[in-house]
Amino acid sequence: MAIRRILRIDDAEDRKILKMQCRPVKLPDRNLKQLVADMFETMRAAHGVGLAAPQIGIPIQLCIIEIPAEYEERADGSVVEVAPAEPYVLINPRIVKMSGEEVMRDEGCLSLPGWYGMVPRQTWVTVEFQDLNGKHHRLRRAGDLLGWAIQHEVDHLNGILFTERIRDLSTLRDITKERDAQPVDQAP
């Protein structure tokens, strides 16, 4: 496995690739499993939830998403996993149905690290895609991180950046500056 360079929205050459309409993946593809492994390693190293192939310079219809595991603290102070991480590989995904109703979400992107803005997303979507074995799937998600991540990653495959979805650019902000501006607790 290898960590790949993530292309940036604010780099002119990278942006050309990020704005491309991606070509479909022809399955089977014996190199795809290694690419997917590299994508997961890259996404995890960048602390992301999703990554599309064009974000690492490969303009094909492939994206990955991993919903983080959930944990609970027990009465004795120990922590236990209550929901495992959910990894998804979506090949040639297409959103085939959507709610028609939007919700505003605070959203960021690994191609513009540290920046977030309010993005309108459908309250539910149905997506059709293939897995690594070429099997076709249909998945509906409503009002959760996976549903919003699907919309974000499919946008990447269509050359649409999250910054283009923001209706009020005053909501676009650099959270690293916000984080750096917070006072440091100096208690002993």
UniProtKB/Swiss-Prot annotation:
Catalytic activity: N-terminal N-formyl-L-methionyl-[peptide] + H2O = N-terminal L-methionyl-[peptide] + formate
GO biological process, one term: translation
Gene3D superfamilies: Peptide deformylase
CDD domains, per database record: Pep_deformylase (cd00487)
InterPro entries noted in UniProt: Peptide_deformylase, Peptide_deformylase_sf
EC number: 3.5.1.88
Keywords carried by this UniProt record: Hydrolase, Iron, Metal-binding, Protein biosynthesis
PANTHER family recorded: PEPTIDE DEFORMYLASE (PTHR10458:SF22)
Name of protein: Peptide deformylase
The organism of origin for this protein: Chloroflexus aurantiacus (strain ATCC 29366 / DSM 635 / J-10-fl)
